[in-house]
Design a protein with these regions (language model features):
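C-terminal regions of RecA-like/P-loop NTPase motor modules
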Residues: 1, 64-96, 138-139, 385-477
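Extended, folded cores of ATP/NTP-driven motor/assembly subunits in large transport
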Residues: 1-98
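A generic structural motif
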Residues: 28-38, 138-141, 312-315, 352
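P-loop NTPase motor domains
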Residues: 55-56, 66-121, 126-127, 172-181, ...
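Short coil/loop residues immediately preceding or within conserved phosphate-binding loops
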Residues: 130
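Hydrophobic anchor at the beta1->P-loop junction of P-loop NTPases
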Residues: 135
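Walker A/P-loop NTP-binding active-site region of P-loop NTPases
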Residues: 141-194
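H-loop/switch region of ABC-family ATPase nucleotide-binding domains
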Residues: 382
Length: 477
């Protein structure tokens, strides 16, 4: 009696002063087997494990049906065997050490299953302080598929606009199926986008032309080339000409008054400085020569909810220029959408191509810095982690991304990422020789292993996969 009295007093003290509660607990272990013998073996093994820890499991003879119903997630316990446990004791049965990631908002998207608990991962990137994202992985690890899955989910769940920079021509089947606009940019294409396009909201300042002039300077720097870039005199005459050719448009902002590259070329020729003629000569092949693809007014619908810029067939001479112009088109779309409250999502596949050139790399860094303020959500896909950390400026892209989907990584990249993101050796195992659609998800301060086993018998899978045999099959359907 004295022992029971001390135990009762200790329990009362816990309940009164140590924030403990009393729970009546029914603990059930469900055993299954394909045969009666297999079931007996499983019950015996479970009982043996429990006995090692001084716990006796009692078989529910003649109550199997009630035990099964009580084990199902129906909140209906039909077994009247209970034991009183305090909060601390009850918590042992619940795996609180398993990190979960589930946000119940109306714009939360699916990102796979928790590899530890098999629970859904549902998150909304807009709730992050910085929604910028990266998808990193070796070829064949599922980078493009992960991006397409998010694109499809965002299209169905949110009202966001979606813009894709597609250097490999992989996104057209999905975009066409969603009734989006695929803009095929190539020397033989009849679809054109005008690099001189501008809108009234192009800059957060009162003068949008200043920011547009900065883009045109970057464009000319890419065209003129050279290690030193544009000379100060060349920058001066280009800036002067930019202000001249936009006067007519801002006086009467109709599509017919939007300048084209040829207007800049002609304005440069009319200047007295020899440097102006030097820049004009460099532009001539893009105006009157065989590379005059961008010397046209825009003749496609760039305001469709989902737009894909397919630059696969751009030659080596044009690809750098094409990527820079696409970046500017995206910026124009983001600024135009600010007043509508929409959050444009911008996907850059093979992002390492953008980081190889100084001008496109600098523009990408600006996008990462400024998109959040304008409501944009950029996502970069790359297999080259070293390119992301090639310079302090480009490294800002990495540091300003609060969401990273990390798939299988090469050995060298694993070590770089482990150091950069403070990944433990155990966590690193989830991106070491991992299967397709498996890896680590970084969402704010949460790091979670995930798996995404997408059903292969769906039409959506056939138009999203990049596997050679399945791509042709999906294209036919």
């Amino acid at each position: 009696m004295a022992t029971y009295g001390r135990d009762a007093k200790a329990l009362l003290k816990e309940l009164q002063s140590q924030n403990e509660r009393m729970f009546l607990v029914t603990f059930l272990v469900l055993n299954t087997g394909h045969t009666e013998q297999e079931l007996e073996n499983n019950v015996f093994q479970a009982s043996s494990i429990a006995q090692k820890h001084n716990c006796n499991l009692c078989r529910l003879d003649f109550q199997q049906e009630q035990g099964l119903m009580s084990s199902l997630p129906l909140a209906d316990c039909q077994i009247e065997i209970q034991r009183g446990l305090t909060t601390s004791s009850t918590a042992i049965f619940i795996p609180f050490t398993t990190q979960e990631l589930y946000q119940s908002g109306k714009e939360s998207l699916y990102y796979g299953l928790n590899a530890l608990s098999n629970n859904l991962i549902m998150v909304d990137r807009k709730k992050l302080k910085n929604p910028n994202g990266l998808i990193l992985g070796t070829p064949g690890s599922g980078k493009s598929f992960s991006a397409k899955r998010e694109i499809a989910n965002a299209f169905l769940v949110t009202d966001d606009d979606i813009i894709i920079n597609d250097p490999e021509g992989e996104y057209s089947p999905l975009v066409n199926r969603l009734k989006g606009q695929v803009i095929k940019i190539s020397p033989n294409s009849t679809q054109f986008i005008n690099p001189m396009d501008i809108n009234a909201n192009y800059s957060e300042e009162d003068n949008p032309l200043s920011l547009k002039a900065d883009f045109i300077l970057s464009l000319c720097e890419l065209v003129v080339g050279g290690k030193e870039g544009l000379l100060p005199v060349e920058k001066t005459v280009i800036d002067r000409c930019v202000h001249l050719i936009y006067r007519k448009f801002f006086a009467d902002p109709c599509p017919e008054n939007m300048p084209i590259l040829e207007d800049l070329y002609n304005a440069l020729l009319q200047q007295d400085e020899k440097e102006a003629h030097h820049v004009a000569t460099a532009l001539e092949i893009y105006v009157k020569g065989s590379l005059n693809l961008f010397n046209h007014r825009t003749n496609v619908n760039v305001n469709n909810r989902i737009v894909c810029y397919d630059i696969k067939e751009l030659g080596k001479q044009m690809k750098k220029l094409g990527m820079l112009i696409v970046q500017d088109q995206v910026w124009g779309r983001v600024t135009a959408n600010r007043s509508s409250g929409k959050s444009p999502r911008y996907y850059m596949d093979e992002m390492q191509l953008l980081l190889k050139e100084e001008q496109t790399a600098a523009y990408s860094v600006e996008i990462w810095k400024r998109f959040r303020k304008w409501g944009g959500i950029p996502t970069g896909l790359t297999q080259n982690v070293k390119d992301l950390l090639s310079s302090r400026e480009v490294e800002n892209i990495f540091e300003n991304s609060d969401m990273i989907i990390m798939l299988n990584q090469a050995a060298g990249d694993r070590q770089i990422l482990a150091k950069q993101l403070y990944i433990s050796p155990h966590q690193l195992s989830y991106v070491t020789h991992s299967g397709e659609g498996e890896g680590l998800l970084f969402f704010g301060n949460v790091i979670l292993p995930f798996v995404d086993r997408f059903p292969t018998d769906l039409e959506l899978y056939r138009i999203m996969t990049t596997k050679l045999g399945e791509v042709s099959e999906g294209a036919q359907k």
